[in-house]
UniProtKB/Swiss-Prot annotation:
Signal peptide interval: none
The keyword Cytoplasm is assigned to this record: yes
Highest rank taxon of the organism: Eukaryota
Annotated keywords: Coiled coil, Cytoplasm, Cytoskeleton
Known function: Centriolar protein required for centriole subdistal appendage assembly and microtubule anchoring in interphase cells. Together with CCDC120, cooperate with subdistal appendage components ODF2, NIN and CEP170 for hierarchical subdistal appendage assembly.
Keyword Cytoplasm tagged: yes
The protein, known as: Coiled-coil domain-containing protein 68
Principal localisation: cytoplasm
Cell compartment(s), UniProt: Cytoplasm, Cytoskeleton, Microtubule organizing center, Centrosome, Centriole
Naturally occurring in which organism (per UniProt): Mus musculus
Coiled-coil region: 86-120, 160-302
Annotated gene: Ccdc68
GO CC, one annotated term: centriolar subdistal appendage
Amino acid sequence: MTTVTVTTEVPSSGKTEDGHVFCDSSSAHIIEETEYVRQMRTTLEKIRNHMFKEKEGCGNARHKLDAEGSGNIQNGSDSTTDPTCLDLLMENMRRKDQQLLEMNRENEVLQIKLEASREAGAAALRNVAQRLFDNYQTQAGDLEKKHEGRKHLLQVNNLEKEQALKGSAESLNLLSEKLEEKHGQIVGLENRVQRMENEKKTLLEKKLRLESKLFQLKSNAANPKSCQDLQTEISILQEQISHLQFVIHSQHQNLRSIIQEMEGLKNTLKEQDTKIENLKEKVTVLEAQNKELKTRVAHWTETPRTLVSKAVSTSELKTEGASPYLMLIRLRK
């Protein structure tokens, strides 16, 4: 008679490179133990069938001996059956019954150990799954906090860029208004200078006529008073022409100054346009990064639930007739 002692040790846990944890040594031990129990069951079934056949053979022999004894009694024969054969058969039957009883007990013990191994494997897997869940929850929380911090920083930068963009747009509008104002001033000055030039031309023509008239009067030696009046009028015209010339020169200087200011405003306007374009590009990049962070946060928020659903399958582990090997196979799928 063979006595089988099965010792099961379930280690705590082990980690793989991708973060999943499995009881490798415990799984191998459970697989070997399950295979050994299966072989023992097969052997016990064969022994039981063999014993039943021997018991049936002994029963047939006993029935044959009883029949022979009855025949001898009916025939009045003085011969009797051999008691040694019956004793041997009975002893053999008792021994086989005892062996069968012990084997049944061993089978029950093995069944209990197998159930205990299953329960231990299931408990270990549940423990591993819980640790995985806690690990994923911690990682998800840390990543979510990290991404939320980056998201807040990006939002602050985005707000600053938007405010700078708004300020640049306002400055651009002010520059445009100043350019319009300067353009109006230039047009007004040009018109004014043109009128002064026309007036100067008129005064010069009038002065030439008066000088020609004065020359004729002097040639004829006419009325001296008329000559004096003409000279006075010519002097007044000359003063007016000189004043107009001074004003025209001043207006030309103002016009050049305004044109220079306008050119400076145009350059500033171009710089503001470039700055606004750069700010728009930065705002677009920040918005894209913000969107990407939102996607990552959503992904890391949903990922632990999916992974836990793969690791925790205790309902399948408790199904009747499932071996620890099958439980590990289901967990790894």
